[in-house]
Amino acid sequence: MTSERKMLVTSALPYANGHLHLGHLVEHIQTDIWVRTHKMLGIQCISVCGDDAHGTPIMLKAEQLGITPEALTAEIKLSHEKDFKAFAIDYDYYHTTHSPENQALATTIFERLQAGGDIVKKTIRQFYDPVKQMFLPDRYVKGTCPKCAAVDQYGDNCEVCGATYSPTDLINPVSVISGASPVEKESEHYFFDLPRYEELLKDWTRKGHLQTEVTNKLSEWFEAGLKQWDISRDAPYFGFPIPGVPDKYFYVWLDAPIGYMASFKKYCDERGVSFDEFWDKTSKTELYHFVGKDIVYFHALFWPAMLAASGFRTPTAVYTHGFLTVEGQKMSKSRGTFIEARAYLAHLHPEYLRYYFAAKLNGRVDDLDLNFDDFVNRVNADLVGKVVNIASRCAGFINKRFDNRLSSELNDPKLHNDLLSARESVIDAFVSRDYARAIRQIMDCADKVNQYIDANKPWVLAKDESKLNEVHAICTMGINLFRILITYLKPVLPMMAKASEEFLNSEPLHWGSIDKPLLNHRINTFKPLMVRVEKEKIEAMLAQSKESLMTTQTKENTPVEDSNLISIEDFAKVDLRIAKIVNAEPVEGADKLMRLILDLGDAQKQVFAGIKKAYDAEELIGRLTVMVANLEPRTMRFGVSEGMVLAAGDGQGIYLLQPDAGALPGMKVK
């Protein structure tokens, strides 16, 4: 089975400042299944990826660790590649954006944009850290919200009232890096003139290159008006210098998508493949990007505009997926559900997760929930109970009674053809990225096979020597039907498929190899292909995740400046009280807010707290916390907030303060 189609497929580049977690794996498993499906069809389908290795967070983390950014990103890249390999995610080339190929391509694209009049210079004002001597990105400034007066809020939005603003609007701003008060400074920046390409983008986004939900979302952004895109950053910065411009660097989001091209360029250079055949604006090949919904703006607006403006082809399609939740909630370090790939691998088989994600992915932008009871049931019932059980039941008789040799004919060719007739529909489901539909169809086929074996009961017939020919025929039929099933599952379960090929003593399975059954064929001794999931292993994984991530949490250690000191009299003005949460409910229309009713012993107060993503309402009711009881009430669009609860945070999670046993509602905190 061969095809003249040529495809290049990419996944979003994982950021090179930390290990992979299960949220990353949703996309990379989704991509890998799709690529394997097409390779089994005989299509030249090349998949590339790499680490996103530039930006301020990497520069600062390397500094914190006392190593160079190059050393940090090289170490993380090895970790990412090791995890991908363990999960059978097989890119044809895995590179890094910190590479000569990427620098050359980024420079070429920038110079072409500049020559075409698409680069605009503007002087902007932004916060500058006088201690670190660097301009501060929005998330590296904190202060008091200018709208609701909530303290310790980031420079781009308030987690309490939901307001968005400029960092320079903050009251009493502080640098997250040094603790110093930032000053405003001017700097000349380079902008890509995105509005020039509005009509091109409107046309491109409405021609089937995106899912309908994404196209509709982009329409909202078009209505709001496209803005020129800042593509430069000031030194110090870890990235590529802008040619001929001292102390200016390309913004990480300029060279990150160019990293797709750079990874493929490296692949081409090593294998003698034509780069231009795939990236020239007249290319007849196909280009597909798999991305998360949080980076659609970059991939569906900036990226195609930048490619078209610099003389390269635009993507055939950008496929977007939703986020991963665990037990219906955002992944949480405190609950142990922020699970790194390596923590999962220490306890569970990687193909359990590949199968589970496949059973839930449907080609839309819906979020995907990992529910561990469902996870156990699907793996144990489907993979072990249905599919593997067919091979183990039939192979035992073939191995022991018939010298490992299958019979010379099928005793139910109609059933064999019935399973084969599902092939085109299964392929279509995989190609359409509706893996859940493919899995349902495959399990329907598995049910038919198990019904056949249960109806014929070879284990009963085997007790009668005169019935051994029937046993031979039934088990030969079962092995051949299993062969069809494992071929259908091969894009999802490549490791199990390889083990099955060895057991079946067959050539690598593909979509066209299963028409002719294995008859009068010697198989090898069966070895268990997959074992049942044990709930204890899931519990151990969650416990490890909670322990390891909590102990390695980044500690906020902001230096205290003399100018920030307050007197004991000032502190005494703050009335801190023990409060019991008697009711909690998420605020509709607010991503982060939870409405709390707090009992202070002799009174109740309503407080809006930015803890919605960290806690479920049910788990808050009845617990004690600490609140600022004498804060001036403030009117928000959701109601009046009469105080503030105290919580700790590290930029990754929020942890509500809770007093020790014996504290009662209304007690003063001294």
UniProtKB/Swiss-Prot annotation:
Residues noted as binding Zn(2+) in the record, renumbered to the chain: C145, C148, C158, C161
Question: Keyword set for this entry?
Answer: Aminoacyl-tRNA synthetase, ATP-binding, Cytoplasm, Ligase, Metal-binding, Nucleotide-binding, Protein biosynthesis, RNA-binding, tRNA-binding, Zinc
Q: Which Pfam families match?
A: Anticodon_3 (PF19303), tRNA-synt_1g (PF09334), tRNA_bind (PF01588)
Report if keyword Protein biosynthesis is assigned.
yes
Q: Specify where it is mainly localized.
A: cytoplasm
Task: State the free-text cofactor note.
Answer: Binds 1 zinc ion per subunit.
Protein name per its UniProtKB record: Methionine--tRNA ligase
